[in-house]
């Protein structure tokens, strides 16, 4: 999804994820044919939805390792415990792929992290949680080229026919590294144009003004 500022793209992602700031008063949010509009955030997460924010929240006092372990534990049947050895082995392997220092595991979630570190951390969470639907809300905002490549690498490593991505961005730059199957342009809360990857290039060349005559 590509959109100018104020078009409703972040509202869309937060409504899908069940953010507390929004209440659905009309319409439905269908996930695999089931309306999830009344589900709580944690229920939507267990249903397979992951939302990466433009500005990831800090969680002082909770280490990255404990945060991830608790999130994975919450998805298991009652009475079943995570294998700690397997968990750390998997987490360290994923961190190595994302070029993350292993010291991050003991640091509080996003506290004192740079913008690029926060985005790497979110991609680590996404890979570890292995969701069926990933919502990336302007996750490329403010990233340098190295961090952008790491984010793209994480996304591309998860691409499959059984997983969906909704990538929300203003810019073509991210799509130089993540090739979309479909591009939808939003304006004033509605999808006003849809196409393939070539639509993103058209937007890059002409800007959003071309929509007024499209």
Positions of predicted regions on the chain:
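ABC ATPase NBD Q-loop/coupling interface
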Residues: 28-44, 110
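Walker B catalytic motif
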Residues: 138-139, 146
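Helical segment within the ABC ATPase nucleotide-binding domain
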Residues: 148-161
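Helix-to-loop junction immediately C-terminal to a conserved catalytic motif
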Residues: 17
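Walker A (P-loop) phosphate-binding loop of ABC-type ATPase nucleotide-binding domains
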Residues: 4-8
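ABC-family P-loop ATPase nucleotide-binding domains
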Residues: 57-132
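Conserved H-loop
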Residues: 162-170
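Conserved beta-strand-loop-alpha-helix hinge in the C-terminal portion
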Residues: 177, 182, 186, 190-213
């Amino acid at each position: 999804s590509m959109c100018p500022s104020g078009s409703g793209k972040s509202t869309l992602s937060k409504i899908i994820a069940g953010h507390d700031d929004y209440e659905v008063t009309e319409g439905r949010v269908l996930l695999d044919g089931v309306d999830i509009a009344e589900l709580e955030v944690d229920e939507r997460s267990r249903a397979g939805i992951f939302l990466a924010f433009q500005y990831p929240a800090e969680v002082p006092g909770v280490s990255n390792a404990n945060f991830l372990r608790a999130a994975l534990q919450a998805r298991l049947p009652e009475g079943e415990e995570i294998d700690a050895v397997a968990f750390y082995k998997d987490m360290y392997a994923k961190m190595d792929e994302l070029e993350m220092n292993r010291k991050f595991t003991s640091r509080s979630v996003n506290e004192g992290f740079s913008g690029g570190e926060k985005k790497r951390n979110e991609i680590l969470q996404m890979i570890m949680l292995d969701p069926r639907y990933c919502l990336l809300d302007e996750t490329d905002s403010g990233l340098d080229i190295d961090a952008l490549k790491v984010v793209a690498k994480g996304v591309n490593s998860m691409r499959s026919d059984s997983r969906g991505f909704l990538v929300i961005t203003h810019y073509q730059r991210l799509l130089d590294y993540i090739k979309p199957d479909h591009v939808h342009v939003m304006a004033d809360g509605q999808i006003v144009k849809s196409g393939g990857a070539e639509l993103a290039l058209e937007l890059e060349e002409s800007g959003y003004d071309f929509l007024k005559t499209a």
